[in-house]
Amino acid sequence: MSEVRKNDHRLMQVLLAPVISEKATLVAEKNEQVVFEVAPDATKQEVKAAVELLFKVEVNSVNVLVQKGKAKRFGRFMGKRKDVKKAYVCLKPGQEINFEAEAK
């Protein structure tokens, strides 16, 4: 864990954006989890350290997944949206991240 904490510059690049969707909102209300879009090469340990550093909360666990990009048609050409790596961050009881307050 101390090896991950040493490089704070790397941790600032791990979290790309919070995922604000219907599913992410339901997960946040039910299970005290927050969903982030993360860098494609980010590890669970880096995501945990980045969330703890940026939001000053305690993280219980991290689950990651890679959402494959959809195949889309651009005129007569077929293209593909980029793959997105998401992290479901489970916070310890009593902890929460309020994005409205963080933005102000």
UniProtKB/Swiss-Prot annotation:
GO terms for biological process: translation. InterPro entries: Nucleotide-bd_a/b_plait_sf, Ribosomal_uL23-like, Ribosomal_uL23/eL15/eS24_sf. Gene3D superfamilies: 3.30.70.330. It comes from the Bacteria. Pfam families: Ribosomal_L23 (PF00276). GO terms for molecular function: rRNA binding; structural constituent of ribosome. Keywords: Ribonucleoprotein, Ribosomal protein, RNA-binding, rRNA-binding. The keyword rRNA-binding applies. GO terms for cellular component: ribonucleoprotein complex; ribosome. One of the early assembly proteins it binds 23S rRNA. One of the proteins that surrounds the polypeptide exit tunnel on the outside of the ribosome. Forms the main docking site for trigger factor binding to the ribosome. Part of the 50S ribosomal subunit. Contacts protein L29, and trigger factor when it is bound to the ribosome. Belongs to the universal ribosomal protein uL23 family. This is Large ribosomal subunit protein uL23. It comes from Paraburkholderia phymatum (strain DSM 17167 / CIP 108236 / LMG 21445 / STM815) (Burkholderia phymatum).
